[in-house]
Amino acid sequence: MKVRNSLKSLRSRHRDNRLVRRKGRIYVINKVQRRFKARQG
């Protein structure tokens, strides 16, 4: 999982990326291509 300041650019890299908020953190998850996982640091 990558830790990035801005997730908007990561989300636009694949059309199946989802922006999810869990426990006060923001994540990008992708069920199809799992390598696009990221968390906002």
UniProtKB/Swiss-Prot annotation:
GO molecular function terms listed in the Swiss-Prot or TrEMBL record: structural constituent of ribosome
Signal peptide (from-to): none
GO CC, one annotated term: ribonucleoprotein complex
Name of the protein in question: Large ribosomal subunit protein bL36
Family to which the UniProt record says this protein belongs: Belongs to the bacterial ribosomal protein bL36 family.
SUPFAM superfamilies linked: Ribosomal protein L36
HAMAP family from the UniProt entry: Ribosomal_bL36 (MF_00251)
Listed Pfam families: Ribosomal_L36
Transmembrane intervals: none
Chain's gene name: rpmJ
